[in-house]
Amino acid sequence: MAEQKRYIYCVIPTNQERKFDLVGLEGEKVYTMNYRDIAAVVSNISLSYEECDPTRRNMKTHTLVLEALMKDHTVLPARFGLISDSGDKLRELLQKYYPTLKDYIKKLDNRMEVGVKVFWEKEAMIAELEGKDQRLTKIKEEIKTLSLPIAEQKLVKAGEMVRSMIEKWVDRYTGRVYLELMKIAVDGKKNYPIDIKNIINSAFLVDKAREKDFDALIDKLDSEYGDKINFKYVKPIPPYNFVNLELYLKEVL
């Protein structure tokens, strides 16, 4: 008889076996598989790793379970699709990586991950650049009176100038905002921008006791730079940026 497969949501600190009032994938109950004072939070599943599709419904279920657990527990989140085909192997991995998992729990205890994305305002940026460098305005005026071949050359020159100016502009605001936020955050991580207008795509680890301080700083920066850049601030989110659970539990696949 094949052993029961289990879908893994996260690891939490607990010395008690728990059954949560939560609905997991395939409508299954969510419960713990324990080792000492930590546990993997799982639900039974019939699918293999290859068969578990990241449908909108499945992704939402995964996220809702994590969000519910985050209210009362320090959570080391697993990304979608981590499935164990052996309960014994899962417990062996909890034992093997117990010191590392405990270190992560200690790092994340009473802390929260927040996401900060910053986008530049095109018109405000161009207006500021033109105000600081009259060469760009001069080239734009010259182009209006030039023949097409010469105008195209001027456009290339203007494009190169704008690209260089934008890079410096982005670096200036990125540095200012990120460094200000790091004055309150315990840790931070810079991720790749999601599009051309996204100049900051970062995650910050913040003490829950300083959540309001961080909120106030976001408001202050938004007021200070709001005509040039826009903030998107999301909290709390599962701390994926500060723990890579798959690195340790991928052996269950």
Predicted regions and their residues:
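An interfacial alpha-helical scaffold signature
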Residues: M1-K232, P236-L253
